[in-house]
Amino acid sequence: FDGRNAAGNDKMSALMALTTRGCCSHPVCSAMSPICG
């Protein structure tokens, strides 16, 4: 187990969550993204 890796993954998933929220509020991006809805 590598603590630095875990922190990096947390940061990455937080960024992904933010991007996902932004994308899913945009009709075109939301339609193209399977994780929206």
Curated annotation (Swiss-Prot):
Pfam families referenced in this protein's UniProt entry, alphabetically: Toxin_8
UniProt modification remark: Unmodified Met-32 is essential for toxin binding to rat alpha-3-beta-4/CHRNA3-CHRNB4 nAChR. An oxidation of this methionine provokes a 13.3-fold decrease in inhibitory potency (IC(50)=245 nM instead of 18 nM). Owing to its potent activity, derivatives of this toxin have a potential in the development of a novel drug. Unfortunately, the oxidation of the methionine is readily to happen during toxin synthesis and oxidation steps as well as under oxidative environment in vivo, which should still be considered to find a solution to this major drawback.
Domain of life of the source: Eukaryota
Tissue: Expressed by the venom duct.
Keywords in alphabetical order: Acetylcholine receptor inhibiting toxin, Amidation, Disulfide bond, Neurotoxin, Postsynaptic neurotoxin, Secreted, Toxin
Chief site of localization: secreted
Annotated localization: Secreted
Effect of G22A: 17-fold and 8-fold decrease in inhibitory potency on alpha-3-beta-4/CHRNA3-CHRNB4 and alpha-6-beta-4/CHRNA6-CHRNB4 nAChRs, respectively
Single GO MF descriptor: toxin activity
InterPro entries (UniProt xref): Conotoxin_a-typ (IPR009958)
Keyword Secreted listed: yes
Cellular component annotations (GO), alphabetically ordered: extracellular region; host cell postsynaptic membrane
Propeptide: 1-21
Resulting phenotype, S30A: 46-fold increase in selectivity for alpha-3-beta-4/CHRNA3-CHRNB4 over alpha-6-beta-4/CHRNA6-CHRNB4 nAChRs
Chain positions found as Cysteine amide: C36
Disulfide bridge partners, by residue number: C23-C29, C24-C36
Record annotation: effect of changing P34A: Complete loss in inhibitory potency on both alpha-3-beta-4/CHRNA3-CHRNB4 and alpha-6-beta-4/CHRNA6-CHRNB4 nAChRs
Note on domains (UniProt): The cysteine framework is I (CC-C-C). Alpha4/6 pattern.
Other remarks on this protein: Negative results: does not show inhibition at neuronal alpha-4-beta-4/CHRNA4-CHRNB4, alpha-4-beta-2/CHRNA4-CHRNB2, alpha-6/alpha-3-beta-2-beta-3 (CHRNA6/CHRNA3-CHRNB2-CHRNB3), alpha-3-beta-2/CHRNA3-CHRNB2, alpha-2-beta-2/CHRNA2-CHRNB2, alpha-9-alpha-10/CHRNA9-CHRNA10, alpha-7/CHRNA7 nAChRs and muscle alpha-1-beta-1-delta-epsilon/CHRNA1-CHRNB1-CHRND-CHRNE nAChR.
Stated role: Alpha-conotoxins act on postsynaptic membranes, they bind to the nicotinic acetylcholine receptors (nAChR) and thus inhibit them. This toxin inhibits alpha-3-beta-4/CHRNA3-CHRNB4 (IC(50)=3.6-18.38 nM), alpha-6/alpha-3-beta-4 (CHRNA6/CHRNA3-CHRNB4) (IC(50)=33.9-94.1 nM), and alpha-2-beta-4/CHRNA2-CHRNB4 (IC(50)=4550 nM) nAChRs. The toxin competes with agonists in the orthosteric binding site of alpha-3-beta-4/CHRNA3-CHRNB4 and alpha-6-beta-4/CHRNA6-CHRNB4.
Family of this protein: Belongs to the conotoxin A superfamily.
Annotated protein name in UniProt: Alpha-conotoxin TxID
Species in which this protein is naturally found: Conus textile
